[in-house]
Swiss-Prot record:
Family: Belongs to the adenylosuccinate synthetase family.
Organism: Ectopseudomonas mendocina (strain ymp) (Pseudomonas mendocina)
Binding site for substrate: 300-306
Residue sites binding GTP per the record: 13-19, 41-43, 306, 332-334, 415-417
Keyword Glycoprotein: no
Protein name: Adenylosuccinate synthetase
Gene, per the UniProt record: purA
Amino acid sequence: MGKNVVVLGTQWGDEGKGKIVDLLTEQAAAVVRYQGGHNAGHTLVIDGEKTVLHLIPSGILREGVECLIGNGVVVAPDALLREITKLEEKGVPVRQRLRISPACPLILSYHVALDQAREKARGDAKIGTTGRGIGPAYEDKVARRGLRVGDLFHRERFAAKLGELLDYHNFQLVNFYKEPAIDFQKTLDECMEYAELLKPMMADVTAVLHDLRREGKDIMFEGAQGSLLDIDHGTYPYVTSSNTTAGGIATGSGFGPLYLNYILGITKAYTTRVGSGPFPTELFDDVGAFLAKRGHEFGATTGRARRCGWFDAVILRRAIEINSISGLCLTKLDVLDGLETIRICTGYKDANGQVLVDAPTDADSYLGLQPVYEEMPGWSESTLGAKTLEDLPAAARAYIKRVEELVGAPIDIISTGPDRNETIVLRHPFA
């Protein structure tokens, strides 16, 4: 009987999920994306060669692994085809192994135009969107007016729906945002070109998943972004437009929760965030600059500098509960090498001096909260590339143990560098 494993982020994204998915796919028959779009950026380093994936599951670099894009993913055809071409130029046979659900909502040019126009109009109150049309595409889906991948293969039906959508969205673009209208014929012609290229990769992803399950194959579900960016459970409104938590798996792929055997939560040994929104442990001093420089904290998708801060046990406890995490993977431990003192946030103090140990449920509730820290000794020795727990300095092992105690979940994997081989596996999710 096969095992079905989930890999998802427990912070604000950028936790290092891509590397871990790539590592674990050695045992998987298939890897599935179930939410988000090409706003995700999963970086993989294999034998020193760096690859950044946005839409295609990270299992694509493992020979023979089937890669599936479930119905919960919003697909920008132009971005997907560019990504396919780049991989094929490296000799990866993407079209033979990638399957896409026809129920995926489409991201088209008017979504991108709306996304960027709105963010521009917000000024200083901007959310920090990647400007790639993700939010507007999900809006169309929920409003039941959106075009889906499967519509591409029915020209007349597609053209009629596209005309209605452009009437609606161009009215906003021109009259409210004072931006140029999107051309109907140009958009239609582009989409018909996409249709020819995408058609061979279409599949009923839900049916494929259940066929694999019945055959006893191991399946991996790859989350994008992080739990605190979830549209329902994140720091609203500074969130993404999809369910980044474990609940998104069933709705975004058609694979029910009772079939899942293990949920691996990825967390950095410190905390980062891209864009606007609450960040209680954010550092504006030399330590914050040290973490950013040592950790190469720049977004794989946008190139934006990430905000850096100390490890926050409060938000991680919330993520563990929401996702029913089986075990954690602690990444970027090596970035902390050389710090004399390391701090862990164990609670938040409000204006009245009361200490809160539960994370607030919206962004405004974070206002005025100050982090309560516990200090631990750092270590001067290098942890880079360590392969066993015994290879780590005693202070690093103590830090790992304390994190486990504070969040109430075991750390089953420790990442000590960017390469897939620079990893300590204490308990394998597929074991």
